[in-house]
Amino acid sequence: MAAKIRRNDEVIILAGKDKGKKGKVTKVLTTGKVVVEGINLVKKHQKPVPALGQQGGIVEQEAAIDASNVAVFNAATGKADRIGFRIEDGKKVRFFKSNGETVSN
C-alpha cells in the first residue's frame, strides 16, 4: 500500500492518551507506525556509557504510534482528513478527499 502519511506531514491524533493533539511526523516506520513530534512521550531509563561520555538517567523521548491512530490535518477545513491519490501531469500526487486540494509535500 502507498504511504498516505509521509515525513513532515501535519497530523492529528485520533486515539490514545494524546487524542486531539497535533504534531509533525518525524519518522515513518515500515511496521505501519509513525513517530510524531511531541506526542506519545515515554521515559527511558538510560545506562551511563563513560567511554562515550554519555550520562545515565531518565530520558524522555517520543515513541511510535500506529498509523491508523493518526490522520493528516487539513488546514483549509481545520479538521482531520483522508488522503487519496491521483495522476496530475504524469505524476502521482496526494489529495484531500473532502475538498480535492493537493497535499503539499
Curated annotation (Swiss-Prot):
A GO term (biological process) for this protein? translation
Q: Does the keyword Repeat apply?
A: no
Query: Which cysteines in this chain are paired by disulphide bridges?
Result: none
For this protein, what is any one GO molecular function term? structural constituent of ribosome
Any one GO CC term of the record = ribonucleoprotein complex
Kindly state which keywords UniProt assigns to this record, in alphabetical order: Ribonucleoprotein, Ribosomal protein, RNA-binding, rRNA-binding
Domain of life per record? Bacteria
Q: Which InterPro entries match?
A: KOW (IPR005824), Rib_uL2_dom2 (IPR014722), Ribosomal_uL24 (IPR003256), Ribosomal_uL24_CS (IPR005825), Ribosomal_uL24_KOW (IPR041988), Translation_prot_SH3-like_sf (IPR008991)
Summary of the function given for this chain in its UniProt record: One of two assembly initiator proteins, it binds directly to the 5'-end of the 23S rRNA, where it nucleates assembly of the 50S subunit.
**What PANTHER family does the database record attribute to this sequence?**
MITOCHONDRIAL RIBOSOMAL PROTEIN L24
Assembly and partners? Part of the 50S ribosomal subunit.
Name the family: Belongs to the universal ribosomal protein uL24 family.
> What is the protein name for this chain?
Large ribosomal subunit protein uL24
Species source reads Vibrio atlanticus (strain LGP32)
